[in-house]
Curated annotation (Swiss-Prot):
A Gly-cisPro motif from one monomer fits into the active site of the other monomer to allow specific chiral rejection of L-amino acids. PANTHER family: D-AMINOACYL-TRNA DEACYLASE 1, D-TYROSYL-TRNA TYR DEACYLASE. This is D-aminoacyl-tRNA deacylase. Keywords: Cytoplasm, Hydrolase, RNA-binding, tRNA-binding. An aminoacyl-tRNA editing enzyme that deacylates mischarged D-aminoacyl-tRNAs. Also deacylates mischarged glycyl-tRNA(Ala), protecting cells against glycine mischarging by AlaRS. Acts via tRNA-based rather than protein-based catalysis; rejects L-amino acids rather than detecting D-amino acids in the active site. By recycling D-aminoacyl-tRNA to D-amino acids and free tRNA molecules, this enzyme counteracts the toxicity associated with the formation of D-aminoacyl-tRNA entities in vivo and helps enforce protein L-homochirality. InterPro entries: Daa-tRNA_deacyls_DTD, DTD-like_sf. It is an enzyme of class 3 (hydrolase). Its main location: cytoplasm. GO terms for cellular component: cytoplasm. Homodimer. It catalyses: glycyl-tRNA(Ala) + H2O = tRNA(Ala) + glycine + H(+); a D-aminoacyl-tRNA + H2O = a tRNA + a D-alpha-amino acid + H(+). It comes from Geobacillus sp. (strain WCH70). A motif (Gly-cisPro motif, important for rejection of L-amino acids) lies at residues 137-138. It is found in: Cytoplasm.
Length: 152
């Protein structure tokens, strides 16, 4: 799995003119799933994101997690994170998992975050979406499950 994590003051996702998810203070996740990903990858990613210390404490240091600050998460599926632009001018998306494989893993990650007590809003899987956010910092990170112990 590959997740772009953005700290946000506010965010919303719209599908066909209707807001389907919105948060205040928290994180926006752009989530990509590849063929080899499993629910174990989803659990790893959820735990990593829930405990990432990327919110400032009273001293202005990034020492607090989304859990610590009572933040929310807006999770948006994004297969284009596995786009390969090394050859030609059109990205190749062969590394992105097909929807029937990606959806259960994406949902498992969201559920694992909810189980930690985080309010999680989502976009609509597979839909064309408009994502609007106010970046806070900005703080933007990439988290990948291939980095967990034992993966190559």
């Amino acid at each position: 799995m590959r997740v772009v994590v953005q700290r946000a003051k506010h965010a919303k996702v719209t599908v066909n003119g209707e807001v389907v998810g919105s948060i205040d203070h928290g994180l926006v996740l752009l989530v990509g799933v590849t063929h080899s990903d499993t629910v174990e990858d989803a659990a790893f990613i959820a735990d990593k994101i829930a405990h990432l210390r990327i919110f400032e404490d009273e001293s202005g240091k990034m020492n607090l997690s989304v859990l610590d600050v009572g933040g929310e998460i807006l999770s948006v599926s994004q297969f284009t994170l596995y786009g390969d632009c090394r050859k030609g001018r059109r990205p190749n998306f062969m590394e992105a998992a097909k929807p029937d494989r990606a959806l259960p893993i994406y949902e498992a990650m969201n559920e694992a975050l909810r189980q930690k007590g985080i309010r999680v809003e989502t976009g609509k899987f597979g839909a064309m979406m408009e994502v609007e956010l106010i970046n806070d910092g900005p703080v933007t990170l990439i988290v990948e499950s291939k980095e967990k112990a034992g993966n190559k």
